[in-house]
Amino acid sequence: MKAILQVINLVLISVVVIIIPPCGAALGRRKA
């Protein structure tokens, strides 16, 4: 179970790192 959770966490982190920067920049521009 722990190994599976670690894999899921790694996948989620990688997805967030890949997807969030452009979205964060767009949201930051909209808020600003």
UniProtKB/Swiss-Prot annotation:
Keywords attached to this entry: Amino-acid biosynthesis, Branched-chain amino acid biosynthesis, Leader peptide
Highest taxon of the lineage: Bacteria
GO BP annotations listed: amino acid biosynthetic process; branched-chain amino acid biosynthetic process
Any Pfam family: IlvGEDA_leader
UniProt KW Nucleus keyword: no
UniProt keyword annotation of Transcription present: no
Name of this chain's protein: ilv operon leader peptide
Gene: ilvL
